[in-house]
């Protein structure tokens, strides 16, 4: 009587030789559909690590397959995707982080913008800081624009909107209090 050997699917591996369980590819696609963050094959291990951190906080979730069930459960989906996004967003931030960009804003962008808008009587500037993390960049912009208000942008009004996928970071940004 012939014996049949059960074949287990071989999981793919990334450049680091780490297993890429196909369920994590589905989670990657779900994250991408939810917020536009895409983890390439080379960076999938970062998503897997974030999923494992989330799984350690959940009862009865011991595998990627279990976690996928949580992510697709209509009652749990929104909260869990938000919590997963809080794990995968980078959150790198500091005041006056990118001097070359501030120089470009000061030397090129604002003078051109002020000239064009003044011609048509518009003296309002709206800025959106997407991916603001804990808010250092939008506060940098506010300080920068207040300095420009004394020179190039007299009589102008400013509005800065700052957003981030990470709710925890946004909560830290709200008070606008920064230490050394």
Predicted regions and their residues:
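Conserved AdoMet
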Residues: 2-128
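Class I S-adenosyl-L-methionine-dependent methyltransferase module
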Residues: 121-180
């Amino acid at each position: 009587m012939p014996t049949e050997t059960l074949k287990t699917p071989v999981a793919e591996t990334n450049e680091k030789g780490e297993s890429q369980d196909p369920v994590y590819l589905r989670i990657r696609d779900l994250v991408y559909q939810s917020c536009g963050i895409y983890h390439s094959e080379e960076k999938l291990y970062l998503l897997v690590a974030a999923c494992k951190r989330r799984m350690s906080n959940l009862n009865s979730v011991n595998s990627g397959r279990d976690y996928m069930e949580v992510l697709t459960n209509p009652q749990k989906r929104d909260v869990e995707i938000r919590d997963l996004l809080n794990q995968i967003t980078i959150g790198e931030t500091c005041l006056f982080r990118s001097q070359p960009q501030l120089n470009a804003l000061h030397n090129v962008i604002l003078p051109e913008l002020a000239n064009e808008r003044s011609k048509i009587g518009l003296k309002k500037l709206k800025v959106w800081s997407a991916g603001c993390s804990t808010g250092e960049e939008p506060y940098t912009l506010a300080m920068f624009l207040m300095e420009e208000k004394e020179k190039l942008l007299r009589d102008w009004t400013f509005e800065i909107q700052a957003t981030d996928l990470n709710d925890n970071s946004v909560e830290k940004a709200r008070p606008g209090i920064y230490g050394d």
